[in-house]
Every structure is written in C-alpha cells, then in structure tokens.
C-alpha cells in the first residue's frame, strides 16, 4: 500500500491509499462462481491490478464484455511480444486470432508467468466470450481481426516515420479506443463516438507507454522491439540504443521531449471525447487512465531517469487520481495541473520548446474555458504545507492502520 517513507513524505496520500487497498480487496472477492468467468476475472487482476479496479466502475454486462475484450487483446499482444516465436509462426496466428476466439479448444503456449497461463488456458476466455451478447461479440471480433492484421504488418516493418508510428499505435491502441466505443454503444449507455476521437484516446495512452518503457524495451532479451520513430530519434543520435548512454544525456533528453510533444497532440481530442460521455461509470473508466497518462508524461518530460530506470507516478498519487476523479471538472483540473507542471519543465533552449509550449497552452485554454478551475478544487501536484512533525505523522499512520484493519475485517461490502 505504498512505502512508509512515501507516506511520511506525502501524508495526504494515506486516505486515498487506504480506500484503494480496501477497494482492491473488495474487487478480488467479487469473482464469479462459473469456472470460465472465475478464470477471466482472476486473470484480469493478475495481468493488470489497476485495470481490474477501474473495470469495477462498470455495470455487470458491460463489465463482462470489457473484461473479455481486454483479455483477448492481452493474449494477442502476448503473441506479438514474444520474440522467441519465429515470424513464420507468429504472423498466421495474429492474422487468424479473431477466429480462434470462437474455438474453445484453441490455445497456444507462449509468453511468461501469468501471460503463459492466459495462453495455456485460453479456452476459458473463449467460453466466456461465447456467453456475451451478439453486439459485444461482433465488436470484439472486428477489432481483434483488424488489430491482428496490423500487428502482423509491423512484425515485418520498422517504425521509420511519424506516420508509421501513428499507424502502429492505431493498430495496437487506437483500435482499443474504437472497440470500447462500440461496446459502450452496444450497451445502450452512450452514443457512438467518432473514430478519430476514439483513436486519439488510445494513441495518447500508447504513446505514453512507449515513451515510459524505453529502457525496458531496448534491453529486452533475446531481441528488442522498439517503436520510437527513426524520423524523431535520428535527429539526435545515430542509433536508438545510444540514448541510454550517459555521454548522450543532453541529446537523449531533447529526443525524449520531442516524443512527449508528439504525444500531447492527442490531449485535446481526449478532452473532447470524455466531455461527451454521459454515464458516470463509463466516464470514470475512461478518465482515470487518461489522467494517469498526462501525469506520466509530466514526470518523463526533461527527465534523464527515463534512460536509467523506471519512471512512474507514485502509488499515492495514483490512488488520489482514482479517488478524486468523479466529473469532467476533475479531469479539466488534472489536465491543467499536469500541463502546468510540464510547462514549468520546458527549457527555452530545447529545439522543440515553441511547439511544446503551444500544445500545452492549447490544453490549458480548453481547461480554463471550461469554467472548472475554481479556487476550491484540490490540486493533483501542489502539495499542501503540512504543520505536522514526524512524530505526529507516525501516530496518525498507526491510527489509520488500525482503522484500515477494522474496515477490512468488518466492512467488506461498504464500497
């Protein structure tokens, strides 16, 4: 639930962390009794605890459809990511994956850890998929077919240009946005969003992940697969792996900032997409990851640590985002706060400074024009001055820990 040191440094995080921990335990207890659905929801919590929590915002039928959609695409992604599989074997599987989901005898052993279990026991996912309504099944099949074909295309193709980068991100994430919009519409809860707005929702998340995961991806064994476009990185270094070497730090940061600036172009579309949502459950499901994305970009921007180790939002801030995100006003507030943080990190000598500032100012203008930026709102990044000394904070921590133990044992269904 976050380290003691982090909580002492940010005591305001404790209550959101407490609520998140209780919510996580509550979600894990909501596993269905049917074996195939029990497998799917258990696997969902293993492959993505955060997604497993966010999905609980949705109503039962839509939640089941989104759960299966997510697991099908994680399985597809596992095949794509396994660099030990030859191209001759991998491409036909990707191309035919949309048919395999109808076959409850099909499985293909690949991946590691929980992903290997997902692939070995894929018949459970197929059985659950077959339980879904026809509108949900058609949407999942269509997106799986298009994504598999796109992944197959890029198995044999490098990401050379920014257009290639956008196309790849469309296949692996933009289509997720389109698919979710179809599922929301099939549920009767939302109007069908435009493809361009849905695509931007996926691209904003995917580009953030590609930026954040540079070091993990470049060091992948036996062979790395990289998605930073040559059109961007070749302006700064001769080889993409050169960015991780300390002697290239200045150029690496400029390249990183170029990548972040490219990702920011999708933020305005994301704000438009979220502002059009009607249902509070679907809204929270969509909004929380988008706030996490702009928060992660703010941490990565101008930060050499991206090339040295892991850069991610602290768990307490993640808990705060999940706790505080209720309305579009909260989203405008978060995007404004994180764009302010980004703006404060822009070096005027950076070759992309003008473009970066222009994109940040466009985001800030939308947030200001919304009328949501009241003086009473809670900031995501400006910490309150604390009058507590360390002893009082520790006492508070002990009291809250006792409260957490009490709530966990006596109020499991209070959320």
Curated annotation (Swiss-Prot):
Pathway assignment: Terpene metabolism; lanosterol biosynthesis; lanosterol from farnesyl diphosphate: step 1/3
Molecular functions (GO terms): squalene synthase [NAD(P)H] activity
Family: Belongs to the phytoene/squalene synthase family.
Xref: InterPro entries: Isoprenoid_synthase_dom_sf (IPR008949), Squ/phyt_synthse (IPR002060), Squal_synth-like (IPR006449), Squalene/phytoene_synthase_CS (IPR019845), Trans_IPPS_euk-type (IPR044844), Trans_IPPS_HH (IPR033904)
Record-listed E.C. numbers: 2.5.1.21
UniProt superkingdom: Eukaryota
Reactions catalysed according to its record: 2 (2E,6E)-farnesyl diphosphate + NADH + H(+) = squalene + 2 diphosphate + NAD(+); 2 (2E,6E)-farnesyl diphosphate + NADPH + H(+) = squalene + 2 diphosphate + NADP(+)
Sequence intervals crossing the membrane: 281-301, 392-412
An individual GO BP term: isoprenoid biosynthetic process
Record-linked Pfam families: SQS_PSY
Protein name in the entry: Squalene synthase 11
């Amino acid at each position: 639930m976050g380290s003691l040191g982090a909580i002492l440094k940010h005591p305001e995080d404790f209550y959101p962390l407490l609520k998140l921990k209780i919510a996580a335990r509550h979600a894990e207890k909501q596993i269905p009794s049917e074996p195939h659905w029990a497998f799917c929801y258990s696997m969902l919590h293993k492959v993505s605890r955060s997604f497993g929590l966010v999905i609980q915002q949705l109503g039962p039928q839509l939640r089941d459809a989104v759960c299966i959609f997510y697991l099908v695409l994680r399985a597809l992604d596992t095949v794509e990511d396994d660099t030990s599989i030859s191209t001759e074997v991998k491409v036909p599987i990707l191309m035919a994956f949309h048919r395999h989901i109808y076959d409850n005898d099909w499985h293909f052993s690949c991946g590691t850890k929980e992903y290997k279990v997902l692939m070995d026991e894929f018949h459970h996912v197929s059985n659950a998929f077959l339980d879904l309504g026809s509108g949900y099944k058609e949407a999942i099949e269509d997106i799986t077919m298009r994504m598999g074909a796109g992944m197959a295309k890029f198995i044999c193709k490098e990401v050379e240009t920014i257009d290639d980068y956008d196309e790849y991100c469309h296949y692996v994430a933009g289509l997720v946005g389109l698919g979710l919009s179809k599922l929301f519409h099939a549920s009767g809860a939302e109007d069908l969003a435009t493809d361009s707005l849905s695509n931007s929702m996926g691209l904003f998340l995917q580009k953030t992940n590609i930026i954040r995961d540079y070091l993990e991806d470049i060091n992948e064994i036996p062979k790395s697969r990289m998605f930073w476009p040559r059109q961007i990185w070749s302006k700064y270094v001769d080889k993409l792996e050169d960015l991780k070497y300390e002697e290239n730090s200045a150029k690496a940061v400029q390249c990183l900032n170029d990548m972040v600036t490219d990702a920011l172009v999708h933020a305005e579309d994301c704000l438009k997409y979220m502002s059009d949502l009607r249902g509070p459950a679907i809204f929270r499901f969509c909004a929380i990851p988008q706030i996490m994305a702009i928060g992660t970009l703010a941490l990565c921007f101008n930060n050499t640590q991206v090339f040295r180790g892991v850069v991610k939002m602290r768990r307490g801030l993640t808990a705060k985002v999940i706790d505080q995100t209720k309305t579009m006003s909260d989203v405008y507030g978060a995007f404004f706060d994180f764009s302010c943080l980004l703006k404060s990190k822009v070096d005027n000598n950076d070759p992309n400074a003008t473009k970066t500032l222009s994109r940040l100012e466009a985001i800030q203008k939308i947030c200001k024009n919304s009328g949501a930026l009241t003086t009473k709102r809670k900031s995501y990044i400006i910490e309150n001055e604390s009058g507590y000394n360390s002893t009082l904070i520790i006492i508070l921590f002990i009291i809250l820990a006792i409260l957490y133990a009490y709530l966990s044992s006596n109020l499991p269904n209070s959320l």
